[in-house]
């Protein structure tokens, strides 16, 4: 789209950009999640509008996609893949590294099973890696990167919450659809490698590691625990509670803005990127207005994380309690 066609978004960005630049945080990134590109309409204009932000905020280092990128409701396997490719190409065109957490919609299996489509058309892990792993330095769909700043040194961990066994049944079909899972192999990597650092750690995942206390989507009356818990999640939850270098957990999946403190560890979720209002507490969304989208610029400065909202919703501020302990106690605590 042309700059003029994006004005319905970018006309609302200047005040937010001014706040980000005034903050002058040493670590800044974009977090966007649950794009579901082309399910309702295209998210590509939203991504293209980010050029306006990046041109004016040179301190933004990378983008994190929280998963569920395309339209897995499309019965045409190539149409589904095309929706994935278009959103990934738009993000890659931003000119900054793009790091992806794989979502439970991304392989297409959930809808293929629900609609009795041929699951052999699913996007399997190797194809997913080719699609989403341009800046992934490993051959897995989970990894970490290290970033040094004047304020401290950090590790960004990107988990794969769809790390399930892709095994076929007697009919050659894949039986596991919406299933969220951390494999034993990934859990061991997380415990023994990802957490093995003196850096402050931020953990990104599609779904929360634990649904306890997380408000989300669906038809449940209380809006709590909308989906099955992440298989393997309790194991990772145990270790992030124990490893005091983990400063925050950031995820999507529930299409809702949550900040929940598990003792001294904040767990953060962010609204879906396009239009849907899946719970009564979500803000109203209107197409071709600023509220059609929702994404954050995430800024870390000292013991605080600032989430500057572009689109529906509000700015948020997160107390990085464990980071404060490093300031006063001189180091991260690994019990």
Language model region names:
Residues 34, 67-68, 103-104, 206, ...:
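Active-site glycine-centered loops adjacent to acidic/histidine catalytic or metal-binding residues
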Residues 2-79:
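N-terminal active-site segment of His-dependent metallophosphoesterases
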Residues 324:
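Short, solvent-exposed beta-strand-to-loop segments that form ligand-recognition rims
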Residues 8-14, 74-192, 235-236, 242-245, ...:
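Extended active-site neighborhood of metal-dependent phosphoesterases/phosphodiesterases
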């Amino acid at each position: 789209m042309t700059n003029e066609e994006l004005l319905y978004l970018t006309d609302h960005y200047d005040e937010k950009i001014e706040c980000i630049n005034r903050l002058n945080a040493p670590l800044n990134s974009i977090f966007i999640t649950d794009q579901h590109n082309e399910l309702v309409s295209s998210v590509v204009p939203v991504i293209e509008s980010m050029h306006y932000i990046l041109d004016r905020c040179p301190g933004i280092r990378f983008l994190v996609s929280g998963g569920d990128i395309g339209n897995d409701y499309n019965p045409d396997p190539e149409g589904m893949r095309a929706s994935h490719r278009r959103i990934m190409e738009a993000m890659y065109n931003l000119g900054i590294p793009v790091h992806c957490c794989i979502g439970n919609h991304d392989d297409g299996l959930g809808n293929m099973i629900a609609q009795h489509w041929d699951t052999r058309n699913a996007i399997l892990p190797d194809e997913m890696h080719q699609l989403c792993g341009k800046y992934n330095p490993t051959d897995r769909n989970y990894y970490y990167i290290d970033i040094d700043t004047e304020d401290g040194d950090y590790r960004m961990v990107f988990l794969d919450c769809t790390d399930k066994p892709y095994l076929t049944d007697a009919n050659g079909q894949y039986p596991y659809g919406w299933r969220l899972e951390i494999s034993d192999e990934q859990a061991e990597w997380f415990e023994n490698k990802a957490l093995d650092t003196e850096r402050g750690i931020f953990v990104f995942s599609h779904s929360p590691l634990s649904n306890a206390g997380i408000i989300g989507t669906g038809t449940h009356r209380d809006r709590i625990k909308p989906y099955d818990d992440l298989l393997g999640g309790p194991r990772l939850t145990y270790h992030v509670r124990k490893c005091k270098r983990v400063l925050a957990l950031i995820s999507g999946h529930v299409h809702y803005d949550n900040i929940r403190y598990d003792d001294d560890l904040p767990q953060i979720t962010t609204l879906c990127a396009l239009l849907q209002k899946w719970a009564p507490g979500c803000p109203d969304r209107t197409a071709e207005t600023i509220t059609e989208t929702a994404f954050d610029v995430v800024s870390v400065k000292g013991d605080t994380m600032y989430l500057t909202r572009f689109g529906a919703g509000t700015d948020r501020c997160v107390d990085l309690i464990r980071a404060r302990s490093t300031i006063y106690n001189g180091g991260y605590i690994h019990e």
